[in-house]
Amino acid sequence: SLHDALPISGLYIHVPFCAKRCLYCDFFSNTEMKYKEPYINALIKEMELRKGYIGNEALETIYFGGGTPSQLDEKDFGKIFEAIYRHFDVAEQAEITLEANPDDMKREYVSLLRNYPFNRVSMGVQSFHPEDLRFLNRRHDREQAIKAVELCKEYGITNISIDLIYGLPNQTQQADRKSTRLNSSHHR
C-alpha cells in the first residue's frame, strides 16, 4: 500500500530555476526567481508529508538536480538541509551532490558550500569550445569552467563530475578528443 515504507536510500531534489534557458534542456525549469521561495516552502512540506515513505532507511545519496541548483543561496540551502535532517536519517558517509553551472561557482559561492554537507559537484560544462557554448546558449566560457573545477578542489570538494555533450552540429571528433584531454588533465 502507499503507506508501506519504500526501501529507498536516495533523495533527489529538483531545483527548477535557471538564470537562462539552455537550448538542449528538456527538464522543467523556470527563469522567474519570484517562484523560488514558494517552491522551497512546498518542497519542505513535501518532505514532511513523505518522511514515513522511507521507513528506517538512512539516505545514502542526496542529489540536488535541476534546473540549476547553484541558483540557490545560503538561506535556501539552510531551509532545505534543516528539513532534510529533521525528516530523514542521513547516512554518515552519504554522497551529497550539487549540480552547478560553472559561472555560478565563484570563490564566494564555493566557500559558502563548505557550510553545508556537499561532498560532490556535478558541473554542467557541456563543452570547452566557444562555438558549442554559444550554440547551446550557455552563460560560461572555457576559462570559467576550468576555474570552477579548480575552486571546488581548492575548497575541498574533490569529487567532481563534468557533463560534456558530444555530437553537436559542426562538432568534430578532433574537438571532442581535445575536450576529453582537457577534462582528463583535471583529474588528480
Which positions does each model-derived feature cover?
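Glycine-centered loop/turn positions within well-structured domains
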Residues: 20, 130-131, 187-188
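Generic hydrophobic alpha-helical segments
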Residues: 25, 50, 187-188
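Structural signature of beta-strand start/N-cap positions in the alpha/beta core
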Residues: 9-10, 58-60
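ATP/adenylate-binding site constellation spanning eukaryotic-like Ser/Thr protein kinases
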Residues: 3, 15, 77
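Conserved non-cysteine loop/helix-boundary elements of the Radical SAM core domain that shape
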Residues: 29-53, 59-183
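Short, small-residue-biased leader/transition segments that mark boundaries at the very start
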Residues: 2-6, 182-186
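Local cysteine-cluster metal-coordination motifs and their immediate loop/turn environment
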Residues: 14-27
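Immediate flanking context of iron-sulfur cluster ligation sites
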Residues: 7-15
